[in-house]
Amino acid sequence: VNFSKAYFGKGDADFQFVDFGNGNVTFEESKFHFGNVIFVNCTFGNGTTNFKKVTFNDGKVDFHFSQFGEGHKIFDQTVFGGGEVDFKRCDFGAGKTDFRRIHFGDGNVTFEESIFTSGKISFKSSDFGHGEVNFHMVNFGADSAIFDNAKFWTGNVSFYHSISSQLSFIECELETFVDLRVDKCGYLDLTDCINRDIIEL
């Protein structure tokens, strides 16, 4: 399925309940303008799912309840507008997941209760903007969750009751309250992290 470099104009882009089946799915370098983008309850089968360098507008971007099969999930260098970004209760399956170098805008960002079965998870060098950031009860699976060099601004950040083998915040900028009262974390790395508020452990 190939929507690379597609342009979605005025109105909502609604993919709710779509089953993309097995095989690669790409929206690389697509642009969404003037409406909400809805991938609620979608199924992405085994294969690469690619949203690299996608530009979203100021509407809500909603992936909640979606399922991803085995394979690489790529959201590298994606730009979100000012609306809410919702990955609540997603199942990211097995395989590497890249959210690197993303600009999340100033809307709230949630991955609450999502599951990553296995594979490295990277939010390295991403900018989370000024909205609230919620990783409450996320299960990061058997591999590392990397937030190195990410920027968290004025919105509160929560990893409350999350489970991970490793959480890395090397050289992060934490300008806000961060809740790290996790359920389980094998290794927590805050090396050279700049913290200007409270980190609750």
Language-model segments: residues:
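N-terminal leader/targeting and pre-domain segments
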Residues: V1-L201
